[in-house]
Amino acid sequence: TDMNPLLLKPSSDHTAQVVLNGRPIGNRDAYEYFRKEGREELRKEVNAAFDRLAARYNPIVMEGAGSISEINLRDTDLVNMPMACYAGADVLLVADIDRGGVFASVYGSVMLQTPEDRKRIKGIIVNKFRGDIRLFEPGIKMMEELCGIPVLGVVPYYKDIHIEEEDSVVLDYKRMQAIEGKVNVAVVLLRHLSNFTDFNMLER
């Protein structure tokens, strides 16, 4: 459980089951979860999980969750810049160009950091690029000049690498057509579906 010590499993639009070190500790709504009261206890457990891993492995690669620039949640953030600060880790900022607005997203994410946290960001990776990379090459230079941080790479959009999605939001965009002559399997999209990645093998 040290690889994912704190897990949220949505149970409604506003509440989620909180799983700490592999054991459910109750359901909390979003407001209750992000309140400072009790937050430090969760932080201690998350940090302790990192310490156990750091004692056994080097290097350790950590993945944040969501955006690093939700400044209204900065004081209670457990997984992004505060975790990098605790671990003394350098940060790579990964930007999704497929959704559009990548320049505003990257620049805003960098500039909304505190000066100390901004120094931790050592590189930018542009993810899910489609099209002719030559058209984006001037944009790479612009991004580096705007942010003062090197763009380390541009990752093409791959459709066949089968990496698990971060959360269930992606399910809203999954639409498959029935194929004649093959066994077709349909999965009902329930509003608060949990463990949805169990069905990934059926897509292949």
Walk through the language-model features, giving the residues of each:
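Flexible phosphate-sensing "switch/lid" loops adjacent to ATP/NTP-binding sites
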Residues: 1-204
